[in-house]
């Protein structure tokens, strides 16, 4: 959205798909395999694209999918528990992510200094800048105000102050927009144009997306699939909740099972009522997955119900 406001042709590669020059390719992997990726890059160049915003997964780094690519800027948001079914430990997961910032692969790292791993990456990156809300950094925000409709804050962007308005709520969106603004400023985009671009973004599909109202209740859909992601979403909504906060979720099958009870605990702590249901069980029994989540919920509350069929669960939750 910032590139668009600046009149710059930009491509986008990530979990939501591949987008450029009015083209859209449905996602298969967060980071495509190298052969397909380079084919997309070539077509982007032919289509007049000059910049690419790309999500690079830890799996892609582990398998060397982006070994031949040199990045102008690499943003580090945070390191939280995920993919331990593959990496085994947080140390190995962090080591995979760290590959993006080491050596000549990344010309400049843009690091979240409120995250311990983000601060540590400053020692391995050849050049880095920082953003934060709680620790000293190059870019930070003050006077943050949030509601269901979005948030606004004053950004200090390398000592240049400007009001930023977002159509998305949540402190995590403040962090993400600061990182985007910092990159855009380094590229040379004027701060008023950066603010215009951020304000023009109506929503990000499935990212704390406001789905509408039902019987006076505001309904949000979020991609949260980790304990940290679920907690951030519930914390973002809680201050603006006029009544009860109901959380409906499940966990994917054949993926990190350790996070299932942890996510149950998060929902029990931060929501008033939890609806446990199925979410892409793959080759596992959906009920077995839900029972693993339930172990975490039961530690803190009895305010929950299991409705394995997702459609029925959604109907129950909105009526609740």
Regions found by a protein language model. Give the residues of each.
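Conserved nucleotide-sensing/catalytic segment adjacent to the nucleotide-binding pocket
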Residues: 24-57
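Conserved helix/coil segment N-terminal to the catalytic DExD/H
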Residues: 59-67
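Switch II (G3) loop of P-loop NTPases
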Residues: 49-59, 218-225
């Amino acid at each position: 959205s910032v590139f668009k406001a600046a009149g710059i042709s930009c491509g986008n590669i990530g979990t939501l798909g591949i987008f450029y020059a009015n083209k859209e390719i449905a996602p298969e992997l967060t980071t495509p395999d190298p052969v397909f990726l380079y084919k997309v890059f070539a077509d982007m160049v032919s289509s007049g694209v000059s910049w690419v915003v790309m999500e690079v997964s830890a799996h892609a780094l582990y398998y060397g999918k982006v070994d031949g690519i040199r990045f102008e800027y690499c943003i580090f948001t945070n390191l939280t528990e995920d993919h331990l079914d593959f990496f085994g430990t947080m140390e190995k997961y962090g080591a995979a992510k760290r590959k993006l910032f080491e050596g000549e692969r990344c010309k400049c790292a843009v690091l979240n200094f409120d995250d311990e791993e983000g601060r540590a990456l400053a020692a391995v990156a050849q050049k880095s800048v920082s953003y934060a809300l709680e620790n000293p950094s190059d870019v930070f925000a003050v006077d943050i105000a949030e509601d269901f409709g979005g948030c606004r804050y004053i950004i200090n962007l390398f000592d240049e102050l400007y009001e930023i308005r977002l159509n998305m709520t949540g402190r995590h969106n403040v962090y993400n927009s600061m990182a985007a603004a910092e990159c855009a400023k380094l590229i040379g985009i004027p701060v008023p144009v950066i603010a215009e671009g951020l304000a023009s973004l109506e929503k990000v599909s499935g990212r704390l997306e406001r789905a509408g109202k039902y019987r006076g209740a505001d309904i949000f859909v979020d991609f949260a699939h980790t304990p940290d992601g679920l907690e951030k979403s519930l914390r973002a909504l809680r201050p603006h909740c006029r009544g009860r906060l109901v959380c409906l979720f499940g966990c994917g099958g054949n993926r990190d099972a350790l996070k299932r009870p942890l996510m149950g605990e998060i929902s029990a702590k931060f929501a008033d009522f939890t609806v446990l249901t199925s979410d892409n069980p793959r080759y596992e029994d959906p009920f077995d997955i839900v029972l693993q989540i339930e172990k975490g919920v039961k530690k803190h509350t009895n305010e929950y119900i299991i409705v394995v069929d997702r459609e029925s669960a959604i109907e129950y939750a909105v009526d609740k």
